[in-house]
């Protein structure tokens, strides 16, 4: 099985310098173009189905891919981004720093939990459950999973246990191949990885 794990395109919240997480914003015009470019790049990969986060930015990215690839979208609630920012969600970052300086400081460590936010442990577990459910039950040879930066980091750090990724760009993606119960990295685009893939 081939698995394409994709991050959505640039959002209006990115442009407005807002805290994202599970803030439900749309793709920006640039994000729409990024999604279109990605769909063209993946058009020859034989992707048969798209599993998507329910958040609007992932859905809009998925719809662009689906139109180009001519395949169905299945929405998986547990693929949504972590509510990492709690009471800061959707706020302009400069305004948040003025109003909630202590909460902004907490964000420097992913294991900290801001008021009304989802803990990292809960987030990692639900992502692992969603990934296992999709990969174990899908009958397709090539699938796409459209989600967010947080899930892509959890994939490498916690699910595959390969290590950290950085400089994660819009519409970044990784192509994996599952052989028996092992995963092999075929290709990645839009981020740096600070580790060697185990053989």
Regions found by a protein language model. Give the residues of each.
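Short, solvent-exposed aromatic-acidic interface loops
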Residues: 186-197
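Phosphate-coordination/substrate-recognition cap region in phosphate-metabolizing enzymes
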Residues: 39-100, 104
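Generic beta-sheet signal
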Residues: 3, 139-149
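Short glycine/proline- and acidic residue-enriched helix-loop micro-motifs
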Residues: 101-122
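Glycine-rich phosphate-binding loop signature in dinucleotide/nucleotide-binding domains
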Residues: 44-46, 134-141
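Loop-to-helix element that buttresses phosphate recognition and phosphoryl-transfer chemistry
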Residues: 7-61, 115-127
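GST superfamily/GST-like fold recognition
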Residues: 149-153, 172
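Domain-level recognition of soluble alpha/beta enzyme cores
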Residues: 162-184
């Amino acid at each position: 099985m081939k698995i394409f794990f994709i991050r959505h395109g640039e959002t209006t919240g990115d442009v407005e310098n807002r805290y994202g997480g599970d803030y439900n914003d749309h793709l920006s015009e640039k994000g729409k173009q990024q999604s279109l470019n990605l769909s063209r790049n993946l058009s020859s990969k034989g992707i048969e189905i798209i599993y998507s986060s329910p958040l609007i930015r992932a859905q809009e990215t998925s719809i662009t891919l689906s139109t180009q690839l001519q395949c169905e979208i299945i929405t998986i609630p547990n693929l949504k981004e972590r509510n990492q920012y709690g009471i800061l969600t959707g706020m302009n970052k400069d305004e948040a720093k003025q109003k909630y300086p202590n909460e902004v400081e907490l964000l420097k460590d992913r294991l900290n939990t801001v008021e009304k936010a989802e803990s990292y442990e809960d987030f990692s577990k639900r992502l692992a459950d969603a990934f296992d459910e999709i990969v174990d039950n899908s009958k397709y040879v090539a699938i796409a999973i459209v989600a967010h930066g947080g899930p892509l980091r959890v994939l490498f750090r916690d699910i595959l246990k390969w290590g950290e990724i950085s400089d994660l760009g819009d519409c970044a993606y990784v192509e994996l191949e599952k052989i028996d119960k092992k995963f092999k990295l075929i290709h990645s685009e839009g981020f740096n990885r600070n580790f060697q893939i185990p053989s």
